[in-house]
Amino acid sequence: MKKLLGLVVSCRMQKTVIVEVKTQVKHALYGKRIMKKKRYAVHDPEKKASLGELIWIRTCRPISKTKKWIYDSSANASQSSR
């Protein structure tokens, strides 16, 4: 099961939020570090995530054509519990 940390950029749909995940990759030839970002449709059945919040998402069975990730927990809540 994969887990990713991302930022909620849209929460207009019912039970779905769009999360943007940023990763740093190294260029194969030149070695420069490049920031890449990808947007995931995430299933959020209880509507816990809010716009601009950092959340953890994890893989799950395909829920629809684009939704293969599910809301796991808020990154802010997990940091405060440590």
Curated annotation (Swiss-Prot):
Its main location: plastid. It comes from the Eukaryota. InterPro entries: NA-bd_OB-fold (IPR012340), Ribosomal_uS17 (IPR000266), Ribosomal_uS17_bact/chlr (IPR019984). It is found in: Plastid, Chloroplast. Keywords: Chloroplast, Plastid, Ribonucleoprotein, Ribosomal protein, RNA-binding, rRNA-binding. One of its GO terms (cellular component) is cytosolic small ribosomal subunit. It holds the Pfam family Ribosomal_S17. GO terms for biological process: translation. GO terms for molecular function: rRNA binding; structural constituent of ribosome. Part of the 30S ribosomal subunit. Belongs to the universal ribosomal protein uS17 family. One of the primary rRNA binding proteins, it binds specifically to the 5'-end of 16S ribosomal RNA. This is Small ribosomal subunit protein uS17c.
